[in-house]
Amino acid sequence: MPVAVHPGRLLRRELAARKLSASRLALELGVPSGRITDIPNGKRGITPDITFRLERRLATSPHFWTNLQTRYDLTVAEEKLGRRLAVEVRAA
């Protein structure tokens, strides 16, 4: 089973590489500070709205962030549901 890596971890690295704080990024993205500061801390996911804002500010693909978030969400769900589904759902 793959290890779940929250996309906020990669955002934290990106911010560090650009010497940019999460609060400053929030200001530049036009969103409340908490919406961004919670992402690197793993307390909030990256929404489609944020992906498009990151695309404009960081020149990254919105699909990059969306794919990271989806992969993380699926991995976490699999970890939570895996055993139960093996018992409850019959394989084809």
What role is predicted for each listed range?
Residues 1-20, 67:
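A short, Lys/Arg-rich alpha-helix, primarily the initiator
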Residues 16, 27, 56:
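Short polybasic/polar patches that bind polyanions
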Residues 20-24, 47:
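Short, charged amphipathic recognition helices of the HTH superfamily
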Residues 23, 34, 63:
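Key DNA-contact positions within bacterial/archaeal DNA-binding proteins
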Residues 30-46, 53-55:
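Recognition helix of helix-turn-helix/homeodomain-like DNA-binding domains
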Residues 49-69:
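DNA major-groove recognition helix of helix-turn-helix/homeodomain DNA-binding modules
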Residues 66-92:
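Short, charged recognition helix plus adjacent turn
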